[in-house]
């Protein structure tokens, strides 16, 4: 237990009765200020303090993937920095990479509030945000300005979604339009067709719907940027296998497994903010309830591809043990979001230090050696 878990987290979660989205918005304003004011003494001092407290630098954690250098395997998942306003800050928190978005071609407000709920009894969150963001053109300007201020020191992914106003039959143009605006600014790109919070979006996981999207993006991808697809944990095995086959046909760089689940296997009986039972609330569940299924999906994909298609594992990672399990199942990289909210800013450091201890115990020289070994 650290200061965050003992003091700040209980205060934010219960005592202040703070709306989770309001807290998140305030945090992002602070991070955006740090990013914009990198030349100011106060911001510089805070960045140095964050880095010295939260970063772990050890070559045994590093790897090269898709021609990119990852200092460590822990990344910030999409959904946290939706508009890319703090891209220079995330390494200071210890992350080896980060993924911004989900961003859509058209700016959109997302779904009505309240739309984000904590489920502490389950170490989970329920969200139905609906891809609220300022749009791809706005993100391009923000990231360009950030790069003018400071060279990027780590890989940045950009997660692309479909605009709500765009009909499903025009999805290809919507995704390609966002990619055209942003392809200069991302080190890798993710096709998000698995959020449960945009009507009809998950239907784009069907091979006949997904194939033209991937083909359109790859036709525009003249620089060969790594392109991945993010899938839902609720798919049947045959559907996952079909997506894996399609990914290989279209020469995707990898798969992100997994997004949030629409299943409601929870301890939480009623959501405090609404008084409703979880089954009455729309949205996806993230955090601990997704842990086991996401690991199973990772293991399935790794076996299906004989380890030839890199996987970014996400879902229910709170500890070094959780991270180790997903790496052994076949994930080359990992992402966190809900666990970071519950465990606090020291979580990444604790996970990395725990992985190094485990490597020492197992006689492992390089962390990448354990990928897919169990």
From Swiss-Prot:
- According to its UniProt record, this protein's enzyme class is oxidoreductase
SUPFAM superfamilies from the xrefs?
FMN-linked oxidoreductases (SSF51395)
Q: Which organism is it from?
A: Acaryochloris marina (strain MBIC 11017)
- Taking the first listed entry, what is the main subcellular location of this protein, grouped into a coarse class? membrane
Q: Could you tell me the keywords of this UniProt record?
A: Cell membrane, Flavoprotein, FMN, Membrane, Oxidoreductase, Pyrimidine biosynthesis
Q: Which NCBIfam families match?
A: PRK05286.2-4, PRK05286.2-5, pyrD_sub2
GO biological process annotation, one example = 'de novo' pyrimidine nucleobase biosynthetic process
Cofactor binding comment, as recorded: Binds 1 FMN per subunit.
For this protein, the record's InterPro entries field holds: Aldolase_TIM (IPR013785), DHO_dehydrogenase (IPR050074), Dihydroorotate_DH_2 (IPR005719), Dihydroorotate_DH_cat (IPR005720), Dihydroorotate_DH_CS (IPR001295)
Q: Which residues form a coiled coil?
A: none
- This one is known as Dihydroorotate dehydrogenase (quinone)
Question: Which amino acids does the record list as binding substrate?
Answer: 82, 127-131, 192, 197, 259-260
Q: Pathway it belongs to? A: Pyrimidine metabolism; UMP biosynthesis via de novo pathway; orotate from (S)-dihydroorotate (quinone route): step 1/1
Residues binding FMN: 78-82, 102, 159, 192, 230, 258, 287, 316, 337-338
Gene it is expressed from: pyrD
Q: What's the stated role of this polypeptide?
A: Catalyzes the conversion of dihydroorotate to orotate with quinone as electron acceptor.
